């Protein structure tokens, strides 16, 4: 299992979610509105508020789906402009179902 975490522009969320839902056996995702900044900082002449609205998308997926999902995120969240976002992939060593109180495989 792998965790995929992406930081994208808010207006890209619906398009991304629709594309991911087309995948057979897509396990689902969480999305939350956040504020942050990276290299695309605000011009210092503007009123100072370095934080930009973003959406953080998280999902835990089987190893064999990682490349396909990352490609979809890179395609669907791309505008070609600064601040398009980032995608991170990290291993998940264990997962548990709270309802079933069992470890998931």
Language-model-derived ranges and their functions:
Residues 1-105:
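Positively charged, small/polar-rich N-terminal and surface patches that mediate targeting and assembly
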